[in-house]
A protein has these predicted regions:
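Acidic/histidine-rich, surface-exposed loop or edge segments in extracytoplasmic proteins
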Residues: 24-35
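Short, surface-exposed coil-to-beta transition loops
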Residues: 27, 77-80
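N-terminal secretory/targeting leader peptides
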Residues: 68-73, 124-129
Length: 130
């Protein structure tokens, strides 16, 4: 009986501590610059197309996209961040594993490249605070 009680207690403790970690959202953020003659409206339009393409693919249904841009600028007014949010790192990884040439999102990438050049990216984990 004692080994069963210990096992149940450990499983409960693990679940209590693991659940919040598993629920953390992840953002993949690309630093981008508009190409000459392009606007943030153009960037939003291709971002919408990218999101539609991503959501049409396996594991992309729950992705979200946003464009972040500075409102006070000391450098380039054409800089913005392209942000893809996934409900978990596992969801992002499963989607990214299907990201290949010939997929809808790869075609959307080519259209995005006509509007902006993106150099480098970072992954961010969001941890809610209560």
């Amino acid at each position: 009986m004692k080994p069963i009680a210990i096992t149940v207690w450990l499983a409960s403790a693990f679940a209590a501590f693991a659940a919040p970690v598993a629920a953390n959202e992840f953002d993949h953020v690309w630093s981008c610059e508009l190409k000459p003659g392009k606007t943030l409206d153009d960037a939003r339009a291709v971002a919408r197309s990218w999101l539609a393409a991503a959501r049409s693919m396996k594991n992309g249904e729950r992705l979200e996209v946003s464009i972040r841009y500075p409102i006070i600028v000391s450098e380039s007014e054409n800089r913005f961040d392209f942000v893809v949010r996934a409900p978990s790192l596992a969801v992002w990884g499963a989607f990214y594993d299907t990201y290949d040439d010939g997929t809808p999102v790869a075609d959307a990438d080519l259209k995005f490249a006509d509007v902006a050049g993106c150099s480098g990216s970072t992954m961010w984990e969001s941890i809610g605070v209560q």
